[in-house]
Amino acid sequence: MTRTVMCRKYQEELPGLERPPYPGAKGQDIFEHISQKAWADWQKHQTMLINEKRLNMMNAEDRKFLQAEMDKFFAGEEYAQAEGYVPPAE
């Protein structure tokens, strides 16, 4: 049986992650409040940010920026976009 969570991003009951994606309290919070769909959407957006903004994951400031953007993304706040990116029409 699939575990469901009340997704913070989409504000509905959706299938949850199989395990925490990070160690510690942050990973547990994501595990308990973020759906598989929201996590997959974040991973796509994160990849775009890393590539378009040329972020270096060895750089602590770049990791800190990405962490802050992840928090905004899941909270439904305004978050950084790749400049010039237009999402495909659905």
UniProtKB/Swiss-Prot annotation:
Keywords: Iron
InterPro entries per the UniProt record, alphabetical: Fe_traffick_prot_YggX (IPR007457), Fe_traffick_prot_YggX_sf (IPR036766)
SUPFAM superfamilies in UniProt: YggX-like (SSF111148)
Any GO BP: cellular response to oxidative stress
GO CC list: cytosol
Pfam families recorded: Iron_traffic (PF04362)
GO molecular-function terms, A-Z: iron ion binding
Entry similarity comment: Belongs to the Fe(2+)-trafficking protein family.
Function: Could be a mediator in iron transactions between iron acquisition and iron-requiring processes, such as synthesis and/or repair of Fe-S clusters in biosynthetic enzymes.
Name under which the protein is recorded: Probable Fe(2+)-trafficking protein
Species for this entry: Pseudomonas putida (strain ATCC 47054 / DSM 6125 / CFBP 8728 / NCIMB 11950 / KT2440)
